[in-house]
UniProtKB/Swiss-Prot annotation:
Signal among keywords: yes
Residue ranges of the region described as Disordered: 20-71, 88-183
Ranges annotated as biased composition (Low complexity): 88-98
One of the record's GO cellular component terms: extracellular region
Record key words, sorted: Secreted, Signal
Protein name: Asparagine-rich protein
Species the sequence originates in: Pinctada maxima (Silver-lipped pearl oyster)
Basic residues: bias regions: 152-166
Tissue specificity: Nacreous layer of shell (at protein level). Expressed primarily in the mantle with highest level in the mantle pallium and lower level in the mantle edge.
Signal peptide bounds: 1-21
Places the protein is found: Secreted
Record field: compositional bias (Basic and acidic residues): 22-35, 44-55, 115-124
């Protein structure tokens, strides 16, 4: 009797379990639907956030920060470079020559403003505005005489009034120095020259910090564009300003031990 009751109880338990399990399956099947409030997977959101970044998402997360940093860096370097070019343009050599569209831009410009009365201007006797001579009383040089139109000839300004070097044209380069001239006191290959020996030592020294930066002229100019620091990348020194220092992409540690709050560096 006892065996029979045990068997019946077991069968009943199995049936109940099966039915209950089916109900759970149905509940699970519907858990993602909008009407279902309970039975949803509570960890779904955090799982989505902890997903291992693939190539595309990693690129997307990193891109904006790097772009911002690069733009700032380029802008500061360009400002500094433009200043350097302004300084070195007076010695026109190398790639620093600025060649304007024309040499003779300021040459024949009228140097005095016309202080004529309005009556004269109404009569058209302001000669600077007239490109051609006109017959009759129209104005220009030949306004008294009647006759065919003649081209207005503009003579060169007297040489002593001329600018030798108009501001926009490059100065002529002097001829190359002869051999005995170029080994003068300050020339680089003159080994008695303290300045160049110091610089040569600098260039040959293995630099692990940017303490002595070669370009002396540049040294004091970097500071104008905000606080900065040098860092070594691909065996070259690069410049980063402090306002960009904290904008780097966050390193995520994928191990199970890491916290959700890990902010990288």
């Amino acid at each position: 009797m006892s065996r029979l009751t045990l068997l019946v109880l077991l069968v009943i338990a199995a049936v109940i379990q099966k039915v209950h399990g089916q109900g759970r399956e149905n509940e699970k099947k519907n858990e993602h639907e909008p009407g279902n409030q309970d039975g949803g997977n509570q960890n779904e959101k955090t799982e989505r956030n902890l997903r291992e970044p693939n190539r595309q998402t990693r690129r997307f997360n990193t891109r904006n920060d790097n772009r911002n940093r690069n733009i700032m860096q380029k802008r500061a370097m360009l400002l500094w470079q433009r200043r350097m070019n302004q300084r070195s343009n007076q010695n026109n050599f190398g790639n620093n020559r600025s060649i304007p569209p024309t040499n003779t831009f300021n040459r024949n410009r009228s140097r005095t403003k016309s202080n004529k009365s309005e009556v004269e201007k109404e009569n058209g006797s302001n000669k600077a505005s007239k490109g051609k001579m006109q017959s009759g009383d129209g104005g220009g040089n030949g306004s008294e005489k009647e006759g065919p139109e003649r081209r207005k000839v503009q003579h060169r300004i007297a040489k002593r009034f001329q600018k030798r070097h108009p501001s926009n044209s490059p100065k002529p380069k002097p001829a190359r120095k002869t051999t005995n001239q170029q080994y003068r006191r300050h020339f680089m290959n003159n080994y008695n020259n303290k300045y160049w020996n110091w610089r040569r030592n600098m260039l040959n020294r293995r630099r692990t910090s940017p303490q002595h930066y070669q370009n002396q002229q540049a040294r004091w100019r970097y500071y104008r564009y905000g606080p900065y620091t040098w860092y070594r990348y691909k065996n070259k020194w690069r410049l980063v300003r402090y306002n960009n220092m904290y904008r780097r992409n966050i390193k995520t540690n994928q191990s199970k031990k890491s916290n959700q709050n890990n902010q990288g560096d």
